[in-house]
Amino acid sequence: MFAVIKTGGRQFRVVPNDVLEIGKITGDVGTIVQLGEVMAVGGDTPVLGFPFIEGASVAAEILDHKRGPKVIAFKKRRRKNSKRKRGYRDEITVIRVTEILTDDKAPTIGPRAKKEKKVEAAPADGEAPAKKAPAKKAAAKKAAPKAAAKKAPAKKAAPKAKSE
């Protein structure tokens, strides 16, 4: 089953588990949002909306909020010494489509559980592995004073004799 949704002035064809980068929408990372502007639903019996399907929505989980790439708008009018450089970065929300809903149904799938970080098991003896001493840093500190050793004063040039 697929759906065509409209968000941020753009249209997307989505299926469950799709990951999309769309214009910024409000919500915290990990929450489920419903996108209500569904233009078409496909599957066994395709349905088209005029312009949207009543009661249909797409549930999606917010994965991240970030900024898009830099876009630079440079305008130059030749031979007039006139130019303008402006730039911007769009705010982007990364979402994962969880399910496509019809008939005003509520989302049944909640946000995914976060993966736990693997914790290294401590040795059974209770001894922690020994860490190497930072020998390179100590050597670098000793080398710096030697390099800044005594410096001979600069000699001045002798004045030139005038010829008559």
UniProtKB/Swiss-Prot annotation:
Q: Name one GO cellular component term.
A: ribonucleoprotein complex
PANTHER family xref list: 50S RIBOSOMAL PROTEIN L21, LARGE RIBOSOMAL SUBUNIT PROTEIN BL21M
Spans annotated as Disordered: 105-164
Q: Which residues form a coiled coil?
A: none
Task: Cite the SUPFAM superfamilies for this sequence.
Answer: L21p-like
Set out the biological process GO terms recorded for this chain's protein: translation
Presence of keyword RNA-binding: yes
Q: Which InterPro entries match?
A: bL21-like, bL21-like_sf, Ribosomal_bL21
Function, as annotated, reads: This protein binds to 23S rRNA in the presence of protein L20.
Q: Which Pfam families match?
A: Ribosomal_L21p
Give the record's family classification: Belongs to the bacterial ribosomal protein bL21 family.
Naturally occurring in which organism (per UniProt):
Afipia carboxidovorans (strain ATCC 49405 / DSM 1227 / KCTC 32145 / OM5)
State the HAMAP family in the record: Ribosomal_bL21
| Domain of life (superkingdom) | Bacteria
Q: Does the keyword Heme apply?
A: no
What name goes with this protein? Large ribosomal subunit protein bL21
Q: How does it assemble?
A: Part of the 50S ribosomal subunit. Contacts protein L20.
